[in-house]
Amino acid sequence: MTNMRKNHPLMKIVNHAFIDLPAPSNISSWWNFGSLIGLCLIMQILTGLFLAMHYTSDTTTAFSSVTHICRDVNYGWLIRYLHANGASMFFICLFLHVGRGIYYGSYTMVETWNIGVVLLLTVMATAFMGYVLPWGQMSFWGATVITNLLSAIPYIGTTLVEWIWGGFSVDKATLTRFFAFHFILPFIITALVMVHLLFLHETGSNNPSGLNSDADKIPFHPYYTVKDLLGVFLLLVTLMILVLFFPDILGDPDNYTPANPLNTPAHIKPEWYFLFAYAILRSIPNKLGGVLALILSILILSILPLLHTSKHRAMTFRPLTQFMYWLLVADLLVLTWIGGQPVEYPFIIIGQLASIMYFATIVIFMPIASMIEDNMLKFT
């Protein structure tokens, strides 16, 4: 069996990636989220596949087909809510994974990090298109508002929007193509995940100290496979509590009303995991400026390696930068709250201040804090 594991062309790849992989001996539970994201992806693909068997991507029957899944299909309600709440768990794991990467300086592995940023953008695009499929009020108006943002692009904006819509408004053609993209993108994400892992295994994992751990490695199996299983158990328990007791807590009540182009909801908002970006978008009165800020709120992650000014890799021994980091986390929570509030005083000004703080903390405060810490080391 050992020979087969080490010599068989396919088994050899699995062995080097998950069994005999040399891993740092001190990585904490914050390193569990990579495997949990993988689990979420597998779960979303499987539940999505079963939903696609019963869903119809037609404006007249889409809403009814989702109702049919919940009422008539065996355990259809379970599959549907696993898929919807699984997306929330996916994003919780993603945000924690990115947060860990920023805290421990994992962005210094530039190729792995940049593939990760591309993955985050792709997952966000997939989730947005998935939200449109049930064809409720928030699905329709969310799709209309977000796709309409592309009209801010000079010269080609309006043509581009109509090309994406497949007509002069969000309609049957839009729903059909969104379903097609929502189906194919998870497989593209899976391919990107493999590239992400390929680059990660070129350099090896980072660790909480931020120091080189080549002198102290342990095999991935059984140590980290067992450790990951605990994370898997906790994730599944949390998800099942969410699905079985509070299935609609993260959804919008408006999405239980069929889409009506003649009736605009009082407050159009995306799913909770996009609210921070939505708040940044709304904080700028200019349409093009808002769109650029929205895109930059994610793309700013890709310039983190350039903004790293410290001699230390991780924030473990950098209290000043740690303070700035937790300020950024608090700011993101404020932005998430603001994104769900109506556009009125005092929420407008809070959103604008929080948006300025978001970019300023990443681009100005954290690099300056790192430089101050480096200078303080000279006096010790």
Curated annotation (Swiss-Prot):
GO terms for molecular function: metal ion binding; ubiquinol-cytochrome-c reductase activity. It is found in: Mitochondrion inner membrane. Pfam families: Cytochrom_B_C, Cytochrome_B. InterPro entries: Cyt_b/b6_C (IPR005798), Cyt_b/b6_C_sf (IPR036150), Cyt_b/b6_N (IPR005797), Cytb/b6-like_sf (IPR027387), Cytochrome_b (IPR030689), Cytochrome_b_C_euk/bac (IPR048260), Cytochrome_b_N_euk/bac (IPR048259), Di-haem_cyt_TM (IPR016174). GO terms for biological process: mitochondrial electron transport, ubiquinol to cytochrome c. The keyword Iron applies. The chain crosses the membrane at residues 33-53, 77-98, 113-133, 178-198, 226-246, 288-308, 320-340, 347-367. Its cofactor is heme b. It is a multi-pass membrane protein. The keyword Ribosomal protein does not apply. Heme b b566 binds at residues 97, 196. GO terms for cellular component: mitochondrial inner membrane; respiratory chain complex III. A ubiquinone binds at residue 201. Binds 2 heme b groups non-covalently. Keywords: Electron transport, Heme, Iron, Membrane, Metal-binding, Mitochondrion, Mitochondrion inner membrane, Respiratory chain, Transmembrane, Transmembrane helix, Transport, Ubiquinone. The cytochrome bc1 complex contains 11 subunits: 3 respiratory subunits (MT-CYB, CYC1 and UQCRFS1), 2 core proteins (UQCRC1 and UQCRC2) and 6 low-molecular weight proteins (UQCRH/QCR6, UQCRB/QCR7, UQCRQ/QCR8, UQCR10/QCR9, UQCR11/QCR10 and a cleavage product of UQCRFS1). This cytochrome bc1 complex then forms a dimer. Belongs to the cytochrome b family. Component of the ubiquinol-cytochrome c reductase complex (complex III or cytochrome b-c1 complex) that is part of the mitochondrial respiratory chain. The b-c1 complex mediates electron transfer from ubiquinol to cytochrome c. Contributes to the generation of a proton gradient across the mitochondrial membrane that is then used for ATP synthesis. PANTHER family: CYTOCHROME B (PTHR19271:SF16). Heme 1 (or BL or b562) is low-potential and absorbs at about 562 nm, and heme 2 (or BH or b566) is high-potential and absorbs at about 566 nm. This is Cytochrome b. The gene is MT-CYB.
